[in-house]
């Protein structure tokens, strides 16, 4: 069992609850629950990525669709002059995000062939990295190609035992609700606009019931034919914050989440805030294991940060604040 790193800024003391073993979920290139080091002659490149999910059909590459993963791999193949092209690259992500879902701290890794020469007219500064990859230049080149909907916040060469998915100790999502009478065009696509007044105190009370080891079948999309799939998860923290100007932010942390789990929980909690459900109905709904029908839209959901054991953590702090998730002055 991995120990948790320090929780993101603003997280409560419940972040220090240890995470027990739970099924790991997310999109990867293999279904085997183990870490594979890079093949000989390749290095493991790690990236911390932010993106606007409403511009893509999720992160997993899909033929004929514009996805975060597909666009990122194409850019990497060009920047690194990958001999085998984009087909020689496979992306492993810390957390799968569906269509419309954003990310601020998505961590990915990809095994690449170090370029024999340099980028552009100048050679790589091989003194920086023995592997011959100038990560600062890779970051600049990628951002020049991927803006404005994708931003690469950091690039480094990861140790071979690092895996963006399986090495993670926790994942933290943030959901933004705009609770105002009129919409805000500057938060469109980044929040769920709810016009009815919400009782934040009862929403906080209800959210506490999600903490712990539970079967979240009532709050998850049923797994599609995945052998050994389970809806049991361990939630270590939940938190609602009123940031002002009607912007409410819900954060939830766990080792792993099942599909649509966060959106289902937020939809349920907003119903509690509207007075349609009681704060005490969470455990009753869990026990029934019947999927409830209040699913929050994807617009407000963001993969906020991912934690790793200290020896495997990316050098870039993953907790931070994107301008799009703060109330405007």
Where is each model-derived feature located?
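Structured-RNA-binding interfaces characteristic of tRNA pseudouridine synthases
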Residues: 3-4, 14, 19-329
């Amino acid at each position: 069992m991995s120990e948790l790193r320090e929780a993101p800024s603003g997280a409560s003391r419940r972040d220090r609850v240890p995470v027990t073993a739970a099924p790991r979920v997310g999109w990867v290139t293999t279904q085997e629950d183990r870490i594979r080091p890079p093949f000989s002659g390749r290095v493991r490149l790690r990236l911390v990525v932010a993106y606007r999910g409403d511009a893509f059909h999720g992160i997993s590459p899909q033929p004929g669709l514009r996805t975060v993963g597909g666009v990122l791999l194409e850019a990497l193949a060009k920047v690194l002059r990958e001999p085998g092209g984009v087909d020689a690259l496979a992306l492993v992500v810390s957390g799968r995000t569906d269509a419309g879902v954003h990310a601020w701290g998505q961590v990915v890794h990809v095994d690449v062939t170090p370029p024999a020469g340099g980028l552009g007219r100048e050679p790589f500064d091989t003194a920086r990295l023995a592997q011959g990859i100038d990560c600062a230049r890779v970051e600049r080149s990628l951002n020049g190609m991927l803006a404005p909907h994708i931003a690469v916040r950091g690039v480094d060469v990861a140790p071979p035992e690092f895996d963006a998915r399986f090495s993670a100790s926790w994942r933290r999502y943030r959901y933004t609700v705009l609770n105002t009478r009129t919409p805000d065009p500057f938060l469109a696509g980044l929040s769920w606009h709810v016009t009815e007044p919400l009782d934040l105190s009862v929403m906080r009370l209800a959210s506490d019931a999600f903490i712990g080891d539970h079967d979240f079948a009532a709050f998850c999309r049923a797994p599609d034919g995945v052998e050994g799939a389970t809806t049991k998860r361990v939630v270590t923290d939940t938190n609602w914050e009123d940031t002002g100007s009607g912007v409410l932010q819900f954060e939830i942390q766990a080792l792993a989440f099942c599909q649509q789990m966060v959106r289902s929980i937020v939809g349920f909690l907003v119903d509690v805030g509207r007075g349609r459900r009681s704060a005490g109905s969470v455990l009753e709904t869990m026990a029934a294991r019947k999927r409830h029908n209040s699913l929050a839209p994807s617009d407000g959901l963001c993969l906020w940060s991912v934690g790793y054991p200290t020896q495997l953590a990316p050098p870039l702090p993953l907790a931070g604040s994107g301008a799009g998730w703060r109330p405007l002055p």
